[in-house]
Amino acid sequence: MRRAIAGSLSCGLSAAEWACNSGFSRIYADTSVAGQGLLAFFAGRTAPPRLVLLYTGVFKTMKSKHPIGILGATGAVGQRFIQLLENHPWFEISWLAASDRSSGKTYAEAAKWRLDTPLPERIAKMTVSPAEPEGAPKIIFAALDAAIAREMEPKFASAGCAVVSNSSAYRMAPNVPLVIPEINAEHLHLIEEQPSRRESGGYMVTNPNCSTIGLVMALKPIEERFGLEQIFVTTMQAVSGAGYPGVPSMDILGNVVPYIASEEEKMEAETLKLLGKLQGHSVEPLFARITAHCNRVAVEDGHMESVSIKLKRQATHEELLAAWAEFRPLAGQGLPTAPDQPIQWAAQPDRPQPRLDRNRGNGMAVT
């Protein structure tokens, strides 16, 4: 079976929305996770973030908003966090942190705002704090490069913070959940295996690679009903996924770049972990063969993927469409930005297309 998948970038959620202009970010809560207010940020289907909030209902009933912080606030992903969170019904940005050269300045002085909506006046006047746990709120959205995240994120978790990370640094760590809420919320139980959870109550949760999210969203209902033996995916990834300033115009205009560093390895490993089963204190990855070929194309926002799969059990065209149409694991939960239909089918032979389909479900659906 072959079908292209376009990940939508919503009002601007992108990795590059994320990272600066494209993305599949979202923020929502899931009351079905019992016992704890678990937070998870998921990075975008196209290049950036996708935020996911898994909670216990406490946010719906509280009279005041819950304070949150953004680590790496002046960068492209940090700016997207601000855009997404500034008017969220449950959260209030109370702390912004960045590098030493930004610390002590107002946010307007420290950051060059590059998004398509105005910098909120309240945020512009906030003072940027040092990137240290002292004074930070208990919920942190981390928008750091992987090398920096590897050092900084455990420090905040050890200080008792819930760290929701957009970085790849700890995605494949055995005791760190890699989560898409529609797919594998039960993996959040791995939090209990983290030393920081036992010592201070803090923990880390990670989001997948932007291209992985769209792929796994489409595969999950098929894997549940028919099983997967083999997956072959070729991506056509928007420049938004490279962040800002991104790919030089002389490299990408009128061109296709058939290489994105570490992208293929990330897609292959993350897909199998996300579709794996929680077995005791660890995740048993899905037993399937997967091959990814990743390409950067001259499209501003919205990734496209061409996917071929081999099933364990035979399925008709109608059965596959039904599996997608009936996949609504978060329906009825009142999550602020979760799409009612996370997987949408475009029947036209020349669809999906990033320009035409990336904003379905307010940019949160896969087509």
Model-derived features with residue positions:
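Short linear segments in intrinsically disordered or otherwise low-structure-confidence regions
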Residues: 10-14, 24, 35-38
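N-terminal Rossmann-like NAD(P) cofactor-binding subdomain of oxidoreductases
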Residues: 55-259, 289, 332-367
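Contiguous C-terminal substrate-recognition/catalytic subdomains in enzyme active sites
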Residues: 133, 255-366
